[in-house]
């Protein structure tokens, strides 16, 4: 074999241009060998919070008339002080979307609010700080102090996870004057529309919290109970009707006995009179289709009120109302029989008395669903139905409009729209917004005894009616005296105006025009019937349009055992437990490695594997640094065949990742990084080009620089800390990777031959590595091999034969055509 003079000159030139090992080692010393997530993350979190970065990267630009706008209506968490894994999940989603949309060229508004008011804080101040509610001013002062302490703790935790909201201008608290003004203005506007009124009637009442509730705040929970069979004697003769009830303590409030008209057992009894045992009161037997013939005896007592069905029957048949339960859940108005006892105590005692008097037929122990205050996990107490004068927002008359317009919002996953639709369809009551608490937004009205509401003048908002005189002395409707409404608003009244607040509906028409409807609502499944529904309804009523174009509903983060996290189970995991050990980026990768809308278990072993992925990325950056670090690299006139192949793989990765981000399929991005970076770049491509990097081959250096940069940009939204650090070290073209554009692969035409070469490379390298392992040879051991395969396979492998030899330490390769691809070890492999 002869070598031409031209080839010798070319080889000598390349030899002279090779980096020496000393030069490479010196460069490598500039790049730490071990990935230090804590150090890197704290560094960048501090940098991101600087004024310069806020202004150039994270600020929503009001003056920008060219860029498309993306507004994220993020959840304002209740200020408990503890950032749990559910918070960490949506914080990661919000931040990831915000960072991606900036790369995509959007002017992003990423706010963060705090749901500050409500019962849990009151209970902390009342019982932990020992501040009495009666001292209203001091109590409210301590509530706010407690709230601010909790916000500080939660904000610090959010920032530690890499969350960069626009704290400078779009952090809000629902107790603040500027936010309260909007809450109160929205209520006054709805009053003008005839949608807010005071009325008296049965309400959901929580005796533990001593406040009225809305339908959305209650639900059923399973409890042990009793089913008491009680004899109601006939008034006009012997015998009687035996009813079955789970609420015998409400016997004194019974207004009728009901049976099903189709029940043959009772058809002849409809209309007859019976006596209420122990209370010597006569009531009638009535017939109603709602009575379940298979429940108990098929005969039930109608009390005021044991459950929602009792309310329906009382209204339908205009039955009298008699209350036997007070605000604290204690029995009253039973002529001393049960007065002063709790509901459970009264239930036990009346069963004993009925048995003693001969009215108790039998008692069964049962497990049944009880209506409870389920919206607050720290309560979960059974609720009662009490007669109260409350303020309501009319909802039911909007049902048809709500069922139509929700379809204008795009849901991810689409199946989540079903839950909103079903909630709207099954609404039974208007929204009771009165709460008998202290720490909340004052309802901006005065009222008279006839129930007329007089709103506060808008120019004095926010206002506490209990502290100032009404705008008029007498009710303009009836002339009666006016009294301040002392109740505060349901906290969902507060949070249902987040979109109106952020988009400037009341105070910034320019921003409102630009940002409404907002781009995205992000939230969990558990608040579809509260935050989502109330925001949707109130925005539709007040602004005449849907509040957001898209709704993203995330699933629930479960404990490592796959069940709901619970302190009693001991499976609660805090995101901050090991954030310093594994890093926020690894936690974020773990949280986003599940399909949006699905529940998934959180395991630290998974986080550990994500850290290994980031260590692998860090190693790749370190390997690349001596060859591409901060260098001006131009595209060569001709690309090596291996580089052509990897750019085809790269094109698929880039396009797939961008599409996945746009569809909120973050798990696809995470999976793609594993399959593309780890399995293809790190395990195959980098090994194949090392020898060319040492020769400073233009094609290898250009290709490596391009794919690493694009990879960092596409990983940045999910893992922003390590990508900022590596970008700064390797490129630093801009002050932040956030200011880069999304990768563009439009210059890469589809190349089927290059893709086929890549498949053949993987098969050949895998077969040769397997051969060495089977023969107990170390990978660096030089060997000679015989490669079998079809014509096309052999032809393409010959193109990159020298690369295979250098990468896999092959002395010689002999080829033989064969239908099957396989590799044999030649006997003189070590010679």
UniProtKB/Swiss-Prot annotation:
It catalyses: tRNA(Val) + L-valine + ATP = L-valyl-tRNA(Val) + AMP + diphosphate. Keywords: Aminoacyl-tRNA synthetase, ATP-binding, Cytoplasm, Ligase, Nucleotide-binding, Protein biosynthesis. Pfam families: Anticodon_1, tRNA-synt_1. It is found in: Cytoplasm. One of its GO terms (molecular function) is ATP binding. Its main location: cytoplasm. GO terms for cellular component: cytosol. It comes from the Archaea. ATP binds at residue 567. A motif ('KMSKS' region) lies at residues 564-568. The keyword ATP-binding applies. Signal peptide: none annotated. Its EC number is 6.1.1.9. GO terms for biological process: valyl-tRNA aminoacylation. A motif ('HIGH' region) lies at residues 77-87. Belongs to the class-I aminoacyl-tRNA synthetase family. ValS type 2 subfamily. ValRS has two distinct active sites: one for aminoacylation and one for editing. The misactivated threonine is translocated from the active site to the editing site. Catalyzes the attachment of valine to tRNA(Val). As ValRS can inadvertently accommodate and process structurally similar amino acids such as threonine, to avoid such errors, it has a 'posttransfer' editing activity that hydrolyzes mischarged Thr-tRNA(Val) in a tRNA-dependent manner. This is Valine--tRNA ligase.
């Amino acid at each position: 074999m002869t070598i031409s003079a031209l080839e010798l000159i070319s080889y000598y030139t390349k030899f002279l241009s090779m980096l020496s090992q000393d030069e490479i080692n010196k460069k490598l010393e500039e790049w730490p060998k071990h990935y230090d997530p804590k150090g890197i993350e704290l560094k960048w979190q501090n940098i991101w919070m600087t004024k310069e970065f806020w202004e150039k990267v994270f600020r929503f630009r009001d003056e920008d008339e060219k860029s498309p706008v993306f507004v994220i209506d993020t959840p304002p968490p209740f200020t408990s002080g503890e950032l749990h894994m559910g918070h960490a999940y949506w914080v990661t989603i919000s931040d990831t979307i915000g960072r991606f949309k900036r790369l995509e060229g959007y002017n992003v508004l990423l706010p963060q609010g705090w749901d500050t008011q409500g019962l849990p804080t009151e209970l902390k101040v009342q019982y932990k700080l020992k501040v009495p509610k009666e001292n209203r001013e001091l109590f409210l002062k301590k509530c706010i102090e407690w709230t601010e302490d909790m916000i500080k703790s939660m904000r610090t935790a959010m920032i530690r996870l890499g969350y960069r909201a626009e704290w400078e201008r779009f952090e809000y608290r629902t107790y603040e004057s500027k936010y309260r003004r909007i809450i109160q203005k929205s209520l006054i506007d709805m009053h003008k529309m005839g949608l807010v009124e005071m009325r008296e009637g049965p309400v959901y009442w929580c005796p533990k919290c001593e406040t009225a509730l809305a339908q959305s705040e209650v639900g059923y929970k399973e409890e042990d109970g009793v089913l008491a069979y009680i004899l109601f004697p006939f008034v006009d003769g012997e015998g009687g009707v035996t009813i079955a009830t789970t609420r015998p303590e409400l016997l004194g409030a019974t207004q009728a006995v009901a049976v099903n008209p189709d029940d043959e057992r009772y058809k002849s009894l409809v209309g007859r009179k019976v006596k209420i045992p122990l209370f010597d009161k006569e009531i009638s037997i009535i017939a109603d289709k709602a009575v379940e013939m298979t429940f108990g005896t098929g005969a039930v007592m109608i009390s005021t009120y044991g459950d929602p069905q009792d309310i329906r029957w009382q209204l339908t048949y205009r039955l009298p109302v008699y209350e036997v339960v007070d605000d604290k859940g204690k029995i009253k108005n039973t002529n001393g029989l049960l007065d002063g006892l709790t509901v459970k105590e009264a239930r036990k005692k009346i069963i004993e008395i009925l048995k003693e008097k001969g009215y108790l037929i039998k008692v069964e122990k049962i497990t049944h669903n009880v209506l409870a205050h389920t919206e607050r996990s720290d309560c979960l107490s059974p609720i009662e139905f009490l007669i109260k004068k409350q303020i309501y927002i009319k909802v039911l008359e909007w049902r048809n409009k709500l069922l139509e317009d929700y379809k204008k919002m795009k849901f991810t996953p689409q199946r989540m729209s079903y839950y909103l639709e079903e909630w709207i369809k099954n609404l039974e009551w208007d929204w009771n917004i009165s709460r008998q608490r202290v720490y909340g937004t004052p309802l901006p009205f005065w009222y008279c005894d006839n129930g007329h509401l007089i709103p506060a003048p808008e120019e004095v908002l926010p206002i506490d009616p209990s502290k100032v005189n009404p705008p008029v002395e007498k009710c303009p409707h009836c002339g009666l005296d006016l009294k301040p409404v002392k109740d505060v608003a349901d906290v969902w009244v507060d949070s249902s105006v987040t979109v109106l607040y952020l988009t400037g509906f009341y105070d910034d028409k320019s921003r409102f025009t630009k940002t409404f409807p907002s781009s995205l609502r992000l939230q969990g499944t558990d608040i579809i019937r509260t935050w989502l529904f109330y925001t949707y309804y109130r925005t539709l009523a007040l602004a005449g349009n849907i509040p957001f174009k898209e709704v993203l509903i995330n699933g629930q983060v479960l404990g490592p055992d796959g069940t709901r996290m619970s302190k009693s189970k001991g499976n609660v995991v805090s995101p901050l437990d090991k954030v310093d050990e594994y890093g926020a980026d690894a936690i974020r990768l773990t949280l986003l490695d599940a399909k949006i809308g699905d529940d998934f278990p959180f395991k630290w072993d998974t986080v550990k594997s994500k850290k290994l992925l980031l260590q692998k990325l860090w190693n790749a950056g370190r390997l690349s640094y001596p060859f591409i670090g901060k260098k001006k690299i131009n595209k060569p006139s001709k690309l090596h065949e291996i580089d052509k192949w990897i750019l085809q793989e790269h094109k698929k990765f880039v396009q797939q990742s961008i599409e996945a981000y746009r569809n909120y399929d973050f798990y696809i991005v995470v999976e793609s990084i594993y399959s593309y970076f780890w399995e293809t770049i790190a395990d195959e491509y980098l090994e194949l080009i090392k020898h060319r990097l040492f020769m400073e081959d233009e094609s290898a250096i250009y290709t490596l620089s391009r794919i690493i940069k694009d990879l960092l940009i596409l990983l940045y939204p999910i893992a922003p800390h390590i990508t900022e650090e590596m970008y700064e070290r390797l490129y630093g073209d801009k002050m932040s990777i956030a200011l880069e554009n999304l990768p563009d692969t439009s210059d890469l035409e589809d190349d089927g031959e290059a893709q086929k070469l890549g498949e053949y490379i993987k098969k050949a390298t895998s077969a040769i590595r397997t051969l060495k392992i089977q023969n107990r040879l170390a990978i660096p051991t030089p060997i000679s091999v015989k490669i079998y395969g079809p014509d096309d396979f052999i032809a393409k492998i010959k193109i990159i034969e020298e690369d295979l030899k250098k990468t896999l330490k092959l002395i010689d390769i002999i080829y033989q055509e064969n239908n099957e691809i396989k590799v044999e070890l030649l006997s003189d492999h070590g010679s």
